[in-house]
């Protein structure tokens, strides 16, 4: 769970689902920075700040004498992952963006000397993909509970898979509207978005997805069937209706006969399962961090007259109120 609002680096998508500024968003009353520093469009500045910090780190970490070689290697992997992630957030929001030199920029120079043009979308994808390969080669395969928020090899390969899937999709693979392709041309006449379809991009994306699958580390979380305990926190499993086939009579993973399908889904969102215990998580910011954690989100879903709920656009519907 991320938040009841987006953050600049939401791990899901770029949809805005906050409650307090819905009218402004719907009416288009926002700038290129979004509706404030807590919203999904406020990405440009923090992303490039992060890229600069990460480049400085990568260019200087080898001078450190306090950390061991394995520790330095892992930190380098994290830095390559995060630099790729920052660029991913940028191209997801703005399309082709400038790729800055890995050695960094001398900000004491005049603006014209350090103003870099936009790279093409394919160039951005290639850079991000290469960064994630470097990260995957250095990162650990798994993290302990105290380091659950740090990226792993699976996180790097998964992000690479998503980036390459987007690159293969029609909008970025020669199928964008002609007026969009024509508009994405820099001052030198360089096309920033390809107008040529390339079937190979799908093969590359499929191979990247296979790299993740072959790790064998991720699977759906399931809660097993219960006859019910002595407390309300352990209710008996509500048996789903029979399907037309044999799924209802087969044990997991070929059916739901021995699991609780509803609880398997519910437990992922009500705080019952920790980030460390969730076998579906690939990259996470942790469990219940910040002021807008699961407890607060639940309160926002309650009616104001029931249990001290807050004003929110995600309140339960009126017919459901008697259940509270």
Describe the residue ranges of each PLM region.
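TPR/Sel1-like alpha-solenoid repeat signature
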Residues: 80, 157-163
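Short, small-residue-rich loop/turn micro-motifs
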Residues: 101-106, 132, 167-169
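Conserved, well-structured interaction surfaces
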Residues: 17-94, 111-148
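Short, flexible loop/turn elements at secondary-structure junctions
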Residues: 103-106, 143, 285-289
């Amino acid at each position: 769970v991320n938040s009841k609002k987006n953050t600049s680096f939401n791990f899901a998508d770029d949809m805005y689902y906050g409650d307090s500024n819905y009218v402004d968003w719907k009416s288009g009353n926002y700038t290129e920075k979004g509706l404030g520093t807590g919203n999904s469009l406020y990405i440009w500045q923090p992303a490039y700040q992060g890229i600069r910090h990460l480049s400085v780190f990568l260019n200087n970490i080898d001078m450190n004498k306090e950390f061991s070689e394995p520790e330095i290697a892992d930190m380098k992997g994290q830095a390559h992952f995060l630099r790729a992630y920052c660029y991913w957030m940028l191209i997801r929001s703005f399309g082709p963006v400038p790729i800055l030199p890995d050695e960094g920029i001398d900000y004491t120079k005049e603006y014209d000397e350090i103003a870099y043009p936009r790279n093409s979308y394919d160039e951005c994808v290639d850079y991000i993909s290469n960064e994630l390969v470097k990260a995957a080669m250095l990162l650990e395969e798994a993290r302990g509970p105290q380091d659950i928020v740090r990226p792993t090899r699976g996180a790097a390969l998964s992000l690479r898979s998503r980036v390459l899937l987007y690159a293969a999709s029609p909008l970025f693979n020669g199928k964008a509207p002609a007026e969009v392709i024509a508009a994405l041309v820099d001052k030198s006449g360089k096309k920033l978005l390809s107008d040529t379809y390339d079937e190979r991009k799908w093969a590359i994306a499929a191979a990247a997805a296979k790299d993740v699958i072959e790790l064998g580390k991720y699977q759906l979380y399931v809660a097993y069937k219960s006859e019910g305990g002595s407390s309300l926190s352990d209710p008996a499993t509500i048996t789903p209706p029979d399907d037309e086939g044999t799924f209802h009579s087969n044990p997991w993973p070929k059916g739901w006969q021995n699991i609780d399908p509803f609880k398997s889904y519910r437990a992922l969102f009500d705080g019952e399962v920790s980030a460390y215990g969730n076998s579906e998580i690939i990259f996470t910011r942790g469990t219940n961090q910040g002021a807008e954690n699961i407890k607060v989100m639940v309160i926002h879903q309650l009616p104001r007259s029931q249990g001290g709920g807050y004003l929110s656009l995600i309140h339960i519907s009126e017919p459901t109120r008697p259940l509270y």
